[in-house]
Structures are given as structure tokens and as C-alpha cells.
Amino acid sequence: MSKPIQMERGVKYRDADKMALIPVKSVAVEREQLLRKPEWMKIKLPADSSRIQGIKAAMRKNGLHSVCEEASCPNLAECFNHGTATFMILGAICTRRCPFCDVAHGRPLAPDTNEPEKLAQTIADMGLRYVVITSVDRDDLRDGGAQHFADCIHAIRAKSPQIRIETLVPDFRGRMDRALEILHDNPPDVFNHNLENIPRLYRQVRPGANYEWSLRLLQQFKQQHPQIPTKSGLMVGLGETNQEIIEVMRDLRAHGVTMLTLGQYLQPSRHHLPVQRYVSPEEFAEMKAEALAMGFTHAACGPFVRSSYHADLQAQGMEVK
């Protein structure tokens, strides 16, 4: 029996090193085995990158992180060029090791107590009117990081009273009641928690997570804050069927969720879970029609859609795909 790897606190484990720590193994895929990307998955980079560099500089200056960079989001150039970013709090090292995700795994450092103030000042300096705040999973913290979320929301509103805040939260595993109690007095304007995929594939896609637990988190927040929209996101291309995705959409509606994002999974490296299929824009359009028919008020469905992709437009009910 091999000895468990002793992780050094503050060290990022990525790609092969990260995947080696996952109990449910995935086999690295060679380049010639990868599915060829269809034409609709080709990304056009903006000609002017000055806005992109400006946002990165502001992040570095204040020691902040964006999930756009840490998770290698394909929309980074487009979003940064439009002056929007999704801030990732509680560090850049996740205590989980999901094999679809490019965020580093390891033993994170203690939360930066100055981060709420630095984040609020950066957002005020950027003049943002809508901001998305997410985080790594922090299973090492007794509240799962909920107090840090609440502190960030409070600090942001103190400096930018007119801003709308969307939070994309982890599942607060084993700490749901405590987390919701902490967030009660400083709730966001949109509460987002991603189911990611179907229950049949959860052990492979989200080791350490629980499908029913995530649904319950969304439901309990909605019960406590009926006036605040709840939102969830799913990826396709991991081995599920369109019908299984539609069943998950029904589960979300049954738990009070009114906003949906649905996008194509892209493999961050050959060590991550491989793409099993590419879903066509026409299929995304069909699933959007299904979502609206079952009562979602907002449904952003398309190959490049991510939870926070044009989140301000999503919240306004505008077309995003």
C-alpha cells in the first residue's frame, strides 16, 4: 500500500500531480485521442489586449485572484476586454480535486483578513455595477468560508452601494446550516451554486460532493430569501445524455431554482477528464426551450456559456449564448 502524499501548505498541485490524488482515476489522453473541436468551438481573440492587461495588473496589485485565470476559462479574453471579471476569494488553492477543473489543489493558507477591503476597493476603483464573487472549496474552515463571503459582500456594498452582487458558492459540505445562518444578514443579489453534471456521474466528476446536498443548499437559501433569485450551472460533454440534463433541470426547478446556465465542458489538459462529445448550438437551443417551458425565468445555454459569463446580462434576462 503506497504512502499518502504529504502536501505542503500553500503549494499548488495541478494537472498530473493533482489527478494523482483523486481516488477515482482518469487516464491521461494523448493528443491524437482527443476529440477534434468543431468549428463552433473556435475562439476569436480580441485585437486590443490593453483592457485585459489592465485588469490583470489590478488583480496582481491587490493580491486578488480571478476564477477566469485560475480555472483557465475560455472566455477570459472576451470578459476582461469588456471590463468584467469573476473574483475568486479565499485563495487560489482548493481543498477538493475535481478532475474537470483546472483550479489548483492543495493545503491552502489561512484566509487573508484584508481581502474583503482590498476586493471592495478594487471593485470601486474599476467602477463595476455588477460583480460575481466565487471561491475555492475550503473544507479546512469550520464555516466553509461563509463568514469571508459575508465580510466581502458587506465591504463591497459599503464602498459601492448601487452594485449588484452575485455569489457562486461552494457546497459548504457538512456546514450548510452554519453557512446559511452567517449569510442571512448579508445575502447577495443572486445566489449561485453549480450542480455541474448529472447524479450518475457525480462520483467521477465531483468526488467529495453530493448531488442531493447541493440541491438542498439551493432550496434552503431560497426558502430563507424567497425574493432573491437562485441559479445553477451544468456542463455537457462528460458522458451524460441530453435527457439526463433535462432531468437535472427538473430537479432544479423542483428546488426553487429560476436561473440556469448550460455550457460545453472543455478539457483543461490531457490529465483531466476527456470530452466525450461536443453538443451543437442547435441542441443547446432545444435545451433552452425546454428550460423556459419548465419555468426557468433565465436560461443561458450555449457552447461557451459559463456560470458567470455575462452574468450581468443574464440577471437582466438578456440573450446570452
Curated annotation (Swiss-Prot):
Protein EC: 2.8.1.8
GO cellular component terms listed in the entry, alphabetical order: cytoplasm
Coiled coil ranges: none
Domain of life, source organism: Bacteria
Gene3D superfamilies reported in the protein's UniProt record: Aldolase class I (3.20.20.70)
Cofactor(s) named in the record: [4Fe-4S] cluster
Gene Ontology MF annotations: 4 iron, 4 sulfur cluster binding; lipoate synthase activity; metal ion binding
Subcellular locations according to the entry: Cytoplasm
Keywords of the record: 4Fe-4S, Cytoplasm, Iron, Iron-sulfur, Metal-binding, S-adenosyl-L-methionine, Transferase
UniProt key word Lyase: no
Domain Radical SAM core: 80-297
Binding residues annotated for [4Fe-4S] cluster 1, in chain numbering: 68, 73, 79, 308
Family of this protein: Belongs to the radical SAM superfamily. Lipoyl synthase family.
UniProt protein name: Lipoyl synthase
